[in-house]
């Protein structure tokens, strides 16, 4: 009969064999974009009015207004990590302007969050 220490060690080694390499990317970054529009209103791009500057929206890297708490392609855990499909990618505010070029958006200020 093996000692309890050896048995626990063998169980631990076997358990490690089933563990996959984990890479938990967190999708908590976002940008707060303040901008003016030549045409249309703030709601057209899912933004809110920010008087007197124009409009304000929080976007993900793909240039789309943030939906939900995080910027993952799919659902994320409660910390914004391990999102199904990884994080959204793109050129942030540049992508926002490209996607909404029909409104003549002029960026005033961009703040990346978290700092």
UniProtKB/Swiss-Prot annotation:
Residues 1-24 form the signal peptide. It is found in: Secreted. Keywords: Cytokine, Disulfide bond, Immunity, Secreted, Signal. Detected in hemolymph (at protein level). Also expressed in the fat body and is probably synthesized in the fat body and secreted into the hemolymph. GO terms for cellular component: extracellular space. Its main location: secreted. Induction: By viral infection with Drosophila C virus (DCV), feline herpesvirus (FHV), Sindbis virus (SINV) and vesicular stomatitis virus (VSV). Strongest induction occurs with SINV and VSV. Highest levels of induction occur 6-24 hours after infection with levels declining steadily until 96 hours after infection. Induction requires the dorsal-related immunity factor Dif but does not require the myeloid differentiation primary response protein MyD88. By muscle tissue stress. Disulfide bonds join 26-81, 27-87, 42-55, 60-71, 76-83. It comes from the Eukaryota. One of its GO terms (biological process) is response to bacterium. Disruption phenotype: Mutants have a shortened lifespan and succumb more rapidly than controls to SINV infection. RNAi-mediated knockdown in fat body leads to accelerated aging of the intestine with intestinal stem cell hyperproliferation, epithelial dysplasia and accelerated induction of apoptosis in the aging midgut. RNAi-mediated knockdown in muscle had no impact on systemic intestinal tissue aging. GO terms for molecular function: cytokine activity. The name 'Diedel' is the German translation of Tweedle and is based on the fictional Lewis Carroll characters Tweedledum and Tweedledee due to the presence of two subdomains within the protein. Cytokine which promotes survival following infection by Sindbis virus by suppressing the immune deficiency pathway. Following infection by the enteropathogenic bacteria E.carotovora limits intestinal stem cells proliferation. When secreted from muscle or adipose tissue, can attenuate age-related intestinal tissue degeneration by inhibiting apoptosis. Contains two subdomains, SD1 and SD2. SD1 is composed of an antiparallel beta-sheet covered by an alpha-helix and displays a ferredoxin-like fold. SD2 displays a new protein fold made of loops connected by four disulfide bridges. Belongs to the Diedel family. This is Protein Diedel. It comes from Drosophila melanogaster. The lineage of its organism: Eukaryota, Metazoa, Ecdysozoa, Arthropoda, Hexapoda. The gene is Diedel.
């Amino acid at each position: 009969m093996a000692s309890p220490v050896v048995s626990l060690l063998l169980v631990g080694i076997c358990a490690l064999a089933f563990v996959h390499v984990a890479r938990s990317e967190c999708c908590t970054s976002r940008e707060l974009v303040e901008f003016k529009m030549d045409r249309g209103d703030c709601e057209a791009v899912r933004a809110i009015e920010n008087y007197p500057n124009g409009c304000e929206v929080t976007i993900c890297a793909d240039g789309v207004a943030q939906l939900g708490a995080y910027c993952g392609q799919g659902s994320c855990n409660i910390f914004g990590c391990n999102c199904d499909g990884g994080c959204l990618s793109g050129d942030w505010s540049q992508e926002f302007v490209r996607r909404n070029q029909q409104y003549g958006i002029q960026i005033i200020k961009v703040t990346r969050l978290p700092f």
